[in-house]
């Protein structure tokens, strides 16, 4: 990678963020597409967010990515939001269009792109969890024409989750069904009629636990996805594969949300296959 007076910067802004794999992905992409850009990680305090966003214009950057805790806090500093960012209420990518800062959320698009030969349009989905990743998957599914969504959260989280789903219905006219994870018979019934089952919780990161009981029976054609990629195969995915179901981890979502952002910044397609190779070697 050559750096010179014309190199344009991009960065991921979060706290903590030093561990991020994003610089690895994007700098590979800049190199592979012969784009004069560089991608770094900025770990900042909340009090520096406004100044950091102002620097996108000041230094004529391509833009930035955002992770926790700044995906929502950044919104007041932007000129415009994309449809999905408005629906989700969170931004993970800011694009500098001639000094106009536009907020996007590429997480949901990235998630659906990583599913092998699967389109959500007209399909039924069961989603476990209602945090940031779940919201982006939810909103994107609605924009892409999903026919039914059942969201399962622990009963203690029901009240916290409902206002967001009500807001989604208000904005899109789409009603999402909200259920308690503890009702196993309801979970079984919803999964039995689903085309896609997604774990969007952090359960399984320990390599031990699974978000659903093992006695749940999966329909044959159900695709199972987990947003976790460390461990590479969670107990949830192992269990799905043991029933003969196709199962996908979260590494593809990470790569394809980055590819979406890269295209928004540069107008170029990220060479995802090449980078996927390096990523799987790194994490498998």
Swiss-Prot record:
The keyword Nucleus does not apply. Pathway: Metabolic intermediate biosynthesis; chorismate biosynthesis; chorismate from D-erythrose 4-phosphate and phosphoenolpyruvate: step 4/7. It catalyses: shikimate + NADP(+) = 3-dehydroshikimate + NADPH + H(+). Gene3D superfamilies: Leucine Dehydrogenase, chain A, domain 1, NAD(P)-binding Rossmann-like Domain. InterPro entries: Aminoacid_DH-like_N_sf, NAD(P)-bd_dom_sf, SDH_C, Shikimate_DH, Shikimate_DH-bd_N, Shikimate_DH_fam. Homodimer. Belongs to the shikimate dehydrogenase family. This is Shikimate dehydrogenase (NADP(+)).
